[in-house]
Amino acid sequence: GIDPNYRTSRQVVGEHQGHKVYGPVDPPKVLGIHGTIVGVDFDLCIADGSCITACPVNVFQWYDTPGHPASEKKADPINEQACIFCMACVNVCPVAAIDVKPP
């Protein structure tokens, strides 16, 4: 699953749709972790959509990632500021790719 310490153990390598991206990244095979409040490990995400369905405040939006070995799209936490910390996304993710931490 996602490294719960990624916010301190990984380097911020960029920004995407208003949230930080934690490396390493080497597209299209290695995409890193997107988000700080709601972190999604793009390298673990298999795009089953359970987090998108479970989230009551629409934190996630599909983002196309052609060529990635795990899936061709990812649940991108573009509205992480809206998170109400219900942990629904964390609880339903089949590959434990999400970590939520209040700011």
From Swiss-Prot:
[3Fe-4S] cluster binds at C45, I46, C51, C93. Keywords: 3Fe-4S, 4Fe-4S, Electron transport, Iron, Iron-sulfur, Metal-binding, Methylation, Repeat, Transport, Zinc. Signal peptide: none annotated. Its cofactor is [3Fe-4S] cluster; [4Fe-4S] cluster; Zn(2+). Gene3D superfamilies: 3.30.70.20. Pfam families: Fer4_10. Residues 1-36 are annotated as: N-terminal extension. GO terms for molecular function: 3 iron, 4 sulfur cluster binding; 4 iron, 4 sulfur cluster binding; electron transfer activity; oxidoreductase activity; zinc ion binding. Binds 1 [3Fe-4S] cluster. Zn(2+) binds at H16, H19, H34, D76. Residues 37-65, 74-103 form the 4Fe-4S ferredoxin-type domain. The keyword Transport applies. Lys-29 was found to be 95% monomethylated and Lys-101 was found to be 10% monomethylated. [4Fe-4S] cluster binds at C55, C83, C86, C89. The modification N6-methyllysine is found at K29, K101. The keyword Chloroplast does not apply. Ferredoxins are iron-sulfur proteins that transfer electrons in a wide variety of metabolic reactions. The 3Fe-4S cluster is reduced by a flavoprotein with NADH oxidase activity from the same organism. This is Zinc-containing ferredoxin. The lineage of its organism: Archaea, Thermoproteota, Thermoprotei, Sulfolobales, Sulfolobaceae. The gene is zfx.
